[in-house]
Amino acid sequence: TTKLLSTLKEDEYILDVVGPLGIPTPIEKFGRVVCIGGGVGTAEVYPIAKALKEAGNEVIGIVGARSKDLVILENEMSAACDKLYITTDDGSYGRKGFVSDQLLDLIKSGNKIDVVYAIGPIPMMKVCGSVTKPFGIKTYVSLNPIMVDGTGMCGGCRVTVGGKMKFACVDGPEFDAHQVDFDELIMRNRTYVDLEKTSLRKLEAHICNLSEKKLAGEVVK
């Protein structure tokens, strides 16, 4: 679906959009809050950081990416946060390492952190939760498991939180990181990996075929 969206041209549009889904993100005056965005998760954590700042919090941001060219929304996050840290896996920009490394340093610095929001790849969110748990810091993660209808009917987005089954589309997307069964979530998200790869190959071949027809001046339907 992401690949299909990227093929849309000017004046083309999505017929219908359903939303917002789930439960609103908890926004209140907590005190000192750390907002962490990993990869494209930065796009989701940015409005949260902005809202938390407007609610009167001291907001510390951490943005992580594999390399400098993949860092996004740096200026926007900088404007929304009192302090912003950048980390890259390869050290090409900011601190070399992971967002969890920076998070642990902030915790160990002695300045009290009241709440953490971590959004990004599942392994990243799992590690951030593991970092904050020994210190008893409330940590929210935003889960985006396999989702079909978005109303809780299909059960595709079910996750185990605190030993109970939840649906990310209606009960989430934010959950307590210390209660999420991340191992189960990772396993479920791999269910359709092979089918997704096959589908992507077919789609790319189809797009390539259409492009060749256009270049040849054929009518494309």
Where are these regions (language model features)?
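FAD-binding FR-type
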Residues: 1-33
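Residues at the starts of beta-strands that form the adenosine-phosphate
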Residues: 13, 32, 54-61, 83, ...
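Short, structured patches in soluble enzyme cores that scaffold and shape functional sites
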Residues: 18-19, 37-38, 61-65, 88, ...
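Short, glycine/serine-rich, charged loops/turns that create anion-binding
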Residues: 21, 40, 66-67, 123
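MIDAS-like acidic motif and immediate structural context at the N-terminus
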Residues: 31-41
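Short glycine/serine/threonine-rich phosphate/pyrophosphate-binding segments
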Residues: 42-48, 124-127
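Reductase modules of NAD(P)H-dependent flavoproteins
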Residues: 67-221
